[in-house]
Amino acid sequence: MTRLLIFSVIAALPLLVQAEAVSSEMETNIPLRAQIKAKESTLIASEMNARINQLKLHDGERFTEGQTLVAFNCSLEEAQLNKAKATLEKASKNYEVKQRLEALKSISALEVAVAKAEEGEARADVQIAQAVLSRCNIKAPFSGKVTDVIAKPYQTVKIGDPLLEILNDKSLEIEFMAESKNLASLAVGKKFQVSVNETGKTYTAEITRLGGKVDPVSQTIKVYGRITDKADDLLPGMSGAIALKP
């Protein structure tokens, strides 16, 4: 009986060694799903109640930083700025006259102080009008591509109405979820490979940062990375798999 038991254990050893090897291999290459996202993306919304004069970009078209994305009809705002400037000029001249009269002891210091305050108020009105007018042209905060056009030319919009969505497709990052038990191996700068489904290619990437917390339910943490290879064919929204070695 004892011999039979020893024989059974010896016979099972190759299977145990094989199972351990498979387990070790699985731990060495942990398959994870990854998604490619744009680091910079935003929804452009209206900051004023106005009619759109210019909205020439279409979905998929490129733009450069500082380029006008949307322009509004701001004839009223321009007129208000001109009026504010004229009022400031009048207030400034009045203040100058008051100062001369004070030097001649012809008026009181109170009248001079009032004239100075009126000039300051007029100057503030000019600044307000300039700030309002600056919202008439929405400039691109970065270079990139249009992903959705919501508004239409000559449409009248209100404050907060969405106009278009944009992103920087040249600044991409990889995002995936990793088990928190492997946190020690997820060092910033660690290299890994990502195979993208849409292109059928494999790219070299590296970890750039980790999420700020571990999900207590799934026991996972967000990991972010960047592709170090030339990857002009990648677009936000593509996905793939990575094999991250511990």
Please provide the spans of the model-predicted regions.
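Surface-exposed patches in structured soluble domains
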Residues: 35, 49, 53-56, 62-68, ...
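Structural microfeature recognizing short secondary-structure transition sites
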Residues: 116, 147-148, 202-246
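A short, hydrophobic beta-strand micro-motif
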Residues: 20, 165-168, 188-198, 225, ...
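N-terminal beta-strand block that forms a small beta-sandwich/beta-barrel module immediately after a flexible targeting
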Residues: 17-49, 208-209, 240-242
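Sec-dependent signal peptide recognition
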Residues: 1-9
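Short coil-to-beta-strand transition motifs
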Residues: 26-31, 139-140, 195-204
